[in-house]
Amino acid sequence: MRRRDFFKFGKKGIVPKTNWEMFLHRVQRLTFSDIKLIDTELQIACIEIKNPNLAQTLISICADHQVAFLYDKLVDIDSVSGRPILLVKVNNNSTPDFVSEGVCVADFTCLCGDLFEKGFNQFEFVPPELNLSQWFNEPSFHDSRPYYSITSGLMEIDTIFSNAMTARLGGFGLNSNIALGNALLNKSIPELFKISQTFEVTELLVSPVWPDELRFDSLFKNISDINLCRVFLGQRGSYIWGQRFYIKALPPKKISPKNIVTSEDEEQEFKINPIDLMELKEIIDPQGIFQYEDEFCEIRNRML
């Protein structure tokens, strides 16, 4: 749908009649960008935006019309099926803002190479052209050792949930009240801690390498305090949308990322029960607005 087609709505009798047409109309009205219809029968559309702050409203529109919100830098579009899709491209590389010495806040489009040049040494082994969303969602960029998700330097995330509600995820303790007013988060936190107590997670905590799974080790007070946002490191785009990242610069050689210290063929005796992860997905993203793990395009494959 082109911009000039949009202005015909309501003037020449061209009005949206179906849920899909109404969805496209709302997206067009929000972005004033050309919508590329990839497949009208399967209801797959693509939009390119310049303002990353439109993500929350786009997610809200997707939730209203039960359309998947998929970020083009994370998804293998050929593996997606079974539901209407909005493929989102963001033509913007933002720059970090420093809130104090060695601590910055950066949008998901900020390039990892820019952060590395500014002294954030945890990005040493991340390809410089990748952005924070790609880094956050790719398991192989994060520390291979249990309890060491702290070496990401990630402190907090301004998070958007599949119902378009927001929360700042970070440290979590007895007096935390971040779940108040957010139904999905309110249901998800007990489920996260429930999974953290399973046999599989208990075994992984004493293993030499954490698998390519959610970082439930971040829910244990060991070398660092409990941190909710670090649970989702390497989440493959499946559970939350990370909009803005609060990151602390780390000295060199603090991180042992999986893409450097482990091989792809290394087998894990224990992995998190997939049924537990499926139940978590149904709680935190019941409509499937975000992608599923098997729809994620591994960064190593994208760069071949």
Tell where the protein language model's regions lie, with residue ranges.
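Glycine-rich N-terminal segment of FAD-binding domains in flavoprotein oxidoreductases
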Residues: 18-109, 120
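A charged N-terminal "starter" segment
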Residues: 1-21
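FAD-binding subdomain of flavoenzyme oxidoreductases
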Residues: 108, 113, 120-255
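Structural signal for hydrophobic packing residues in well-ordered secondary-structure cores
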Residues: 24-31, 62-66, 112-120, 140, ...
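General beta-strand structural signal in soluble alpha/beta enzymes
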Residues: 2-9, 35-39, 46-49, 67-73, ...
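Activity-critical C-terminal alpha-helical subdomain
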Residues: 270-304
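Short glycine/threonine-rich loop-to-helix capping motif typified by GTGT followed
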Residues: 17, 221, 244, 261-276, ...
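Glycine-rich, small/acidic residue-mixed loop/short-helix segments
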Residues: 233, 249-250, 256-266, 272
